[in-house]
C-alpha cells in the first residue's frame, strides 16, 4: 500500500526486486502508475490519499476513514503472505492496525521508518503494536525500531542509487547567484 508518489516509486522498485526473487509473486493493494506498471491493480486511485494538513483532511475525513477500512478488508480477503505498507503512516499504519487486529498472525512490514529520531519518538512504540518489520532508508534508524521490539533492516535510500548530474546539468545549476529551492 502506497499513498503518495514517493511511496509509489519505492513500491515499484520493491515489487521489481520481489518479482526477480519469485516470478510468481502477486500484488494487490493501492498504488500509483509505477506500481501498476509492475502488475498492481490498485483498489482505488492512490491520489485520494494524497492529502496534507488539517484544512485538506477535515472535509475528506469520513471518506479516508472508509478507505482505511476498505483497504484492510481487501488485504485480509486476498490472504497475503505479508502486508507491506509504504510510508504514508497516517493511512498505512491504521490499515495495518485493523488488519493485524483481525488476523494477528499476518506478517506486517512497513517501508520507510518514521522519523522518530527527529520528532514524535513515541510513534515507534505505538507502531510496534501492528508492525513486525521495518525497512529503513537511513543507516541509523534500525536501533530506534529494534528498541521497541520491531525487527528492522537498513535497505538504503533510493536517491543514492540515482545517477549523478551530467556535466551539462551541473553547468546549468552552477550560476553566480545562490541556488534557491522552494
Features from the language model and the residues they span:
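Active-site and donor-binding regions of nucleotide-sugar-utilizing enzymes
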Residues: 1-176, 180-182
Amino acid at each position: 500500500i502506497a499513498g503518495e508518489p514517493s511511496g509509489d516509486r519505492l513500491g515499484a522498485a520493491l515489487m521489481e526486486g520481489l518479482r526477480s526473487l519469485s516470478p510468481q509473486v502477486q500484488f494487490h493493494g493501492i498504488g500509483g502508475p509505477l506500481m501498476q506498471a509492475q502488475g498492481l491493480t490498485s483498489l482505488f486511485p492512490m491520489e485520494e490519499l494524497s492529502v496534507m494538513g488539517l484544512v485538506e483532511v477535515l472535509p475528506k475525513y469520513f471518506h479516508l476513514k472508509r478507505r482505511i477500512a476498505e483497504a484492510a478488508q481487501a488485504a485480509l480477503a486476498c490472504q497475503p503472505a505479508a502486508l507491506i505498507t509504504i510510508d504514508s503512516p497516517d493511512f498505512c499504519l491504521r490499515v495495518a492496525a485493523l488488519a493485524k487486529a483481525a488476523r494477528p498472525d499476518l506478517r506486517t512490514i512497513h517501508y520507510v521508518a518514521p522519523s522518530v529520531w527527529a520528532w514524535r519518538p513515541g510513534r515507534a512504540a505505538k507502531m510496534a503494536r501492528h508492525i513486525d518489520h521495518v525497512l529503513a532508508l537511513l543507516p541509523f534508524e534500525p536501533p530506534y525500531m529494534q528498541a521497541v521490539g520491531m525487527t528492522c533492516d537498513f535497505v538504503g535510500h533510493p536517491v543514492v542509487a540515482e545517477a549523478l548530474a551530467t556535466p551539462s546539468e551541473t553547468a546549468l545549476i552552477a550560476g553566480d547567484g545562490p541556488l534557491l529551492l522552494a
